[in-house]
Swiss-Prot record:
Residues 1-17 have a biased composition (Basic and acidic residues). HAMAP family: GrpE (MF_01151). It comes from Helicobacter acinonychis (strain Sheeba). It comes from the Bacteria. It is found in: Cytoplasm. One of its GO terms (biological process) is protein folding. The gene is grpE. Keywords: Chaperone, Cytoplasm, Stress response. This is Protein GrpE.
């Protein structure tokens, strides 16, 4: 009987150990599962952060790419601006020669030649986006540079009286403002 009792005790001891082992295993499994969940959550957070960083960097890259394309386009569009600036004194000389021709010389071959040359030059310039600045009545500091003020009975204060030097634009951008005199009546 004692053997039987020992056997039962041994058996119950084994069951208890087995149960403890299984509980420990289940506990370890649960602990491992919790750690796996934490690791997975950390991974997902880091993945989200990295993905957001990637999207921002990609957007920045696209913006830089667009800006470079725009800058390149502007550089190509205004590449001839320096040449246009260098041509302006030639135009001024032609205009001066034309203006200095006296009334009798207006019909001379030289005057007609100057007029044709100026006309052709203006056509070429217009074809390449270079145009003269209009100097009508109103003074506009964006397009005109007031060199002097003169008394004028015919013009109101601040109105353009005389164009001293023609101004030019290249594709809408001012190459050189027109030099003008404006009316100043006290």
């Amino acid at each position: 009987m004692k053997d039987e009792h020992n056997q039962e005790h041994d058996l119950s001891q084994k069951e208890l150990e087995s149960c403890e082992n299984s509980c420990t295993c289940e506990g370890k499994k649960q602990e491992a599962s919790e750690k796996e969940c934490e690791i997975k959550e950390d991974f997902e957070l880091k993945y989200q952060e990295m993905h957001e960083k990637y999207l921002r960097v990609h957007a920045d890259f696209e913006n830089v790419k667009k800006r470079l394309e725009r800058d390149k386009s502007m550089a190509l569009e205004y590449a001839y601006e320096k040449i246009a600036l260098d041509l302006l004194p030639v135009i001024d000389a032609l205009l001066g020669a034309h203006k200095s021709a006296s009334g009798d010389d207006k019909e001379s071959a030289l005057t007609k030649g100057l007029e044709l040359t100026m006309e052709k030059l203006h056509e070429v310039l217009a074809r390449h986006g270079i145009e003269g600045i209009e100097c009508l009545e109103e003074f506009d500091p964006n397009f005109h540079n007031a060199i002097m003020q003169v008394k004028s009975e015919e013009k109101e204060n601040g109105k353009i009286v005389q164009v001293l030097q023609q101004g030019y634009k290249y594709k809408g951008r001012v190459l050189r403002p027109a030099m003008v005199s404006i009316a100043k009546n006290d």
